[in-house]
């Protein structure tokens, strides 16, 4: 009897605990839903341009992603103004400059820097900048000769064309008719990478440089940094010299073959946009006999490196024995007589009555700082004369062997003077006022 009573009491206890009252818990009641998980951070993990979507490409391009920058290169002849990108990304959608993109379908212009944004389901976004560089990023110049003829002479032009893909920073130039020949002296004879000169029929703007007919392609073979000429040109632009050449680096193809990186520059010549001396002015260069062209007209002076050869670069067509020739020969020799004469410091009778002193100072400072080996007495020492005016020094030119880039002269050393021992400057330094 006691056992039955115990069982009944135990069952009653269980019923009381189970629940009909307000204080119990129903074990079958639904559990609350967990908090939603945040979407993965938006990110582009791969960006490619596939030949299957871009017929103009010769090979697939897989871009490099570095934080928020996406970079890559494409061949120089590829068109990038309508490319289809393929993405691998974390997120729900991608846009370019606010325009939604269909992965592997939408075409966009990648000529300039492009801003891409990827967004996830939570509305978070991440921005990237895409830099698809054509070739090296420099403008590309295409030179083509008639019948793909080789450029073998620096005296005789051959017919051809030039075209420019200016890339991101320069204007394109459609195929244009030119003439082309070699240029230079030792740079033409000794080096496998040849320098060139091209000539348009009409004045033409070239790589952002003010229009003119003739343009030089400096190979810079002796200067493996390719920095010396351009660095010194910048020094010239900072000086008070009236004119200093401009230049632009470019990749050059000749008859479809890559020729290398060139420094494309203005030519040192008479022009309203270059050496502005007019039709009656003279552009002169200290030079060497063996460097002369057959049609060059020149004269000697008595004192410059005994004697000094002065090549008359302008005006064109000047002839020996003409009044124009006699004038400039006599004027430069009269200057030398005044410079080396007894009263050379006299304002009225000395060198100051012949030369524009500030230009002579600036020319010297630039050439001495850079230890330009040619500038002491060898070549590329330019100066100009307009009848009735004083002799102006410049433009500066030819610095591929400056800044110690020689092993045969003391100009290779940082210490000491070099250009100061130019005969004219050596005498000028004897005047404390100079």
What are these regions (language model features)?
Residues 2-9:
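Sec-dependent signal peptide recognition
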Residues 24-138:
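Beta-rich interaction/scaffold domains
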Residues 35, 125, 131-434:
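Phosphate/dinucleotide-binding and metal-coordinating scaffold of catalytic cores
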Residues 15-16:
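C-terminal motif of bacterial Sec signal peptides marking the signal peptidase cleavage site
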